[in-house]
């Protein structure tokens, strides 16, 4: 039976335990996701408390991280999503994304509406990918792909 969570703390505590186990075992998120049939970003989101894993994926991930049965069950429960504290993020990486939306949010909105009409880009029917590429000017660049289904607003 599908279960839902109403308290974010239990999944945040599990995320802390998962990150500790990941570090002790020197595993990457890609290594943990390998064999699940799911995207690295989706499995990572589940491990950090923002998605639910199918039972088979939860068991596979649980075995890699030496999680107990309760933790494996928690990974399958529908979490309280988007539950980062209701404030401007202070973590430097997360803050840069916040800044990007502050600067380019209205641009993204205008371009989406111009190209698609009134509606939203789904975060449910969604894919996320992060790649590291060489910068021709030296160093490295992050290529982040947000791939969401467009959902038009429907008058009623």
UniProtKB/Swiss-Prot annotation:
The keyword Lyase applies. Gene3D superfamilies: Cyanate lyase, C-terminal domain, lambda repressor-like DNA-binding domains. This is Cyanate hydratase. HAMAP family: Cyanate_hydrat. Keywords: Lyase. Disulfide bonds: none annotated. InterPro entries: Cyanase, Cyanate_lyase_C, Cyanate_lyase_C_sf, CYNS_N, Lambda_DNA-bd_dom_sf. Belongs to the cyanase family. Catalyzes the reaction of cyanate with bicarbonate to produce ammonia and carbon dioxide. One of its GO terms (molecular function) is DNA binding. The active site is at 96, 99, 122. GO terms for biological process: cyanate metabolic process. Its EC number is 4.2.1.104. It catalyses: cyanate + hydrogencarbonate + 3 H(+) = NH4(+) + 2 CO2. It comes from Escherichia coli O9:H4 (strain HS).
